[in-house]
Structure formats: structure tokens, C-alpha cells
Amino acid sequence: MIRQLVSGLVVAGLVANAGAARAWDPTVERQAQAAIAEFKKADPSIEAFFDEAYGYAIFPEITKGGFGIGGAGGDGAVFEQGVAVGSSHMSQVTIGLQAGGQTYREAIFFKDKAALDGFKRGDFELAAGASAVAVKNGASKAAGYERGVAIFTMALGGLMFEASVGGQEFTFEPR
């Protein structure tokens, strides 16, 4: 009962915050730069994505939790040709068999200007079936873009069992 109550409160907080645009925060950019260094340290082959992508969004810490109904959320920085151009908020609501909580990083690479512009306009949502590559040494060598986007995640902590459905939604706020 207590676990369900705590999970419900976490989900309610995440959902209430889901569509909130975030003002530019230099702390998030610093955290994103540190996350970029950690991605590269964990898998040096990911450097090619940072070098060749037109832009990318880096979410240094996404928190996810649930028990039956779940949610996730986190703030990140958006870069265009290596320069920070704005901030983003990711939110997700999931329904299905799930229990636990975890934190992770997420990097979304945009192959070209059109893909990044779609993200900035709000025309971007990761569907439930979108695939992300878990960053580990050499994993990004075999990864590629799908519809102009490549997604990588890096676990930070926690344990989550899930067989659930839910997509990620993003907001963008220019710098």
C-alpha cells in the first residue's frame, strides 16, 4: 500500500510537470557537458556521433519510477553544431507491468538540420517502440540513425522491472 502511494505521488509530480517549459539554466549546460564526457569515457566510439551530428540533446539525469503506472522526467541542454542553443524537458507516462525506480542519462542525436528543427518546433516524440542503444564500450559503432535520429542511454542507478507502454515527449526553450 505504501509503495503504491509513493509511486502514485512520484507519477503525479512527473505528470504535473510534463508540459512545463524550462527557462535557460547554465547549471544544466554544465551538467550536460559533464554527461557528454561520461558518454565518451564509457564508449569512445560515440565521439563520431558528437562530431558528425548536426545537433544533439543531452539529458544528464532522467528519473523514472512506477508501480503499475509510471513516469519519468528530466531536464537537458540542446546543442546545434556544438553550441548550446536552448533547454529541453523530457516527460513520459507509462502504463503496464512495472515496479521500481532508476536514473539514467540520455543523448539524442539529430543527423541534420531538419531533424533538429522538428525537435525545436515540438514535432518530436519518441514512440513506445523507439529503440535506444545502451552505452558501453564499442556499442555505438554498430548504431545508426533512424528517421534522422539516434538515441543512446546510460544507466546511473536503481532497478526497474517493466513491460510497459509509453512514449517520451519533449519541450524546447531557446536560450
Language model features with spans:
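Positively charged n-region of N-terminal signal peptides that target proteins for export
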Residues: 1-4
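Bacterial N-terminal signal peptides
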Residues: 6-17
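Sec/Tat signal peptide C-region and signal peptidase I cleavage site
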Residues: 17-23
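Small-residue-enriched, tightly packed secondary-structure blocks
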Residues: 23-175
